[in-house]
Amino acid sequence: MPINIPINLPAKQILESENIFVMDEKRAFHQDIRPLNIVILNLMPQKIKTETQLLRMLGNSPLQVYFTFLIPSTHTPKHTPRQHLEQFYTTFSSIRDRKFDGMIITGAPIEHLEYEEVSYWEELREILDWSKTHVTSTLHICWGAQAGLYHHYGIRKVKLPKKTFGVFEHRIMEKNERLVRGFEEFYYVPHSRHTDINMDDLKAVSHLKVLSISDEAGVCLIASKDEKQVFLTGHPEYDTDTLKEEYERDLARNMEIDPPVNYFKEGPDGAVPVNRWKAHATLLFMNWLNYYVYQETPYEWK
């Protein structure tokens, strides 16, 4: 079954051009199937780009999936057209009484701020608490993962002396975990962050399990033992060119930035990005959707 998205969502045309099976709401209505309901709290500035990246990761699912896009009501996005937000997004007050099979909380480029300095922090705390009783499993990405670990377990982020930036090799720590089923022992994930999570702090929380780590990029994949919370410190959803765009952006701002590690390959026309992560990224999202969401969610929420 395909992902089920609004007929006018910009991502629809992009995904269809990539041969990813999508279905609009009108067609999905005629299928006598209970779709999975996933809410995406999109905290990234370029919301349309992030929507497309996440929907691409979930687009090969055999399950029919319906998406609700969420933004904080206490923050006004500056990089997404107002019309798009009004047409496709909602706020927490309109969904707080609903139950969802899964939730994705994206990253946000606000690592330099303390959590309490973030304009929507109190609202995010409320959403995180709500997710424990209204969502089967929540996937937190990058800053969203750090914020979730801080809120739920009191684990603080640690400022790095140098930005972790590039595509890094990771190894599986728990080979029998459902979330990494089908993975090779080593796989790649893009990272782009100035802060990290300390492994000793994670080990001190008995309710958490570390599923993969990198010698260079640190801890990557963490899950709660009840599988209701997943924390991903990298960006497996990134497009091939995303790190390149971030690198060129920072150069244009005259920032000190090294080229992303293990990312560019010299070709006849100069250095070009190489995508080493897409297959495992898709598998990770599929495993989360199948094992942590579909296999665990009730057919009828009470």
From Swiss-Prot:
Q: Which residues form a coiled coil?
A: none
Name of the protein this chain belongs to = Homoserine O-acetyltransferase
Gene3D superfamilies hit by this protein? 3.40.50.880
- EC number(s) on file: 2.3.1.31
PANTHER family from the xrefs? HOMOSERINE O-SUCCINYLTRANSFERASE
Active-site residues annotated for this sequence: 142 (acyl-thioester intermediate), 235 (proton acceptor), 237
Its family remark reads: Belongs to the MetA family.
Kindly tell me the pathway this chain contributes to.
Answer: Amino-acid biosynthesis; L-methionine biosynthesis via de novo pathway; O-acetyl-L-homoserine from L-homoserine: step 1/1
Residues where substrate binds: 163, 192, 249
Name of the encoding gene: metAA
What does it do?
A: Transfers an acetyl group from acetyl-CoA to L-homoserine, forming acetyl-L-homoserine.
Q: Which InterPro entries match?
A: Class_I_gatase-like, HST_MetA, MetA_family
Site note Important for substrate specificity applies to 192
Class in the EC hierarchy, top level: transferase
GO molecular function terms attached to this record: homoserine O-acetyltransferase activity; homoserine O-succinyltransferase activity
Question: What NCBIfam families does the entry give?
Answer: metA (TIGR01001)
SUPFAM superfamilies to which the protein is assigned, alphabetical = Class I glutamine amidotransferase-like
Keyword annotations for this protein, in alphabetical order, are: Acyltransferase, Amino-acid biosynthesis, Cytoplasm, Methionine biosynthesis, Transferase
Q: Give an example GO biological process.
A: L-methionine biosynthetic process from homoserine via O-succinyl-L-homoserine and cystathionine
Q: Where is this site: Important for acyl-CoA specificity?
A: 111
Q: Which reaction does it catalyse?
A: L-homoserine + acetyl-CoA = O-acetyl-L-homoserine + CoA
Q: Where in the cell is it found?
A: Cytoplasm
The scientific name of the source species is Bacillus licheniformis (strain ATCC 14580 / DSM 13 / JCM 2505 / CCUG 7422 / NBRC 12200 / NCIMB 9375 / NCTC 10341 / NRRL NRS-1264 / Gibson 46)
- Identify the HAMAP family for this entry: MetA_acyltransf (MF_00295)
What GO cellular component entries does it have?
cytoplasm
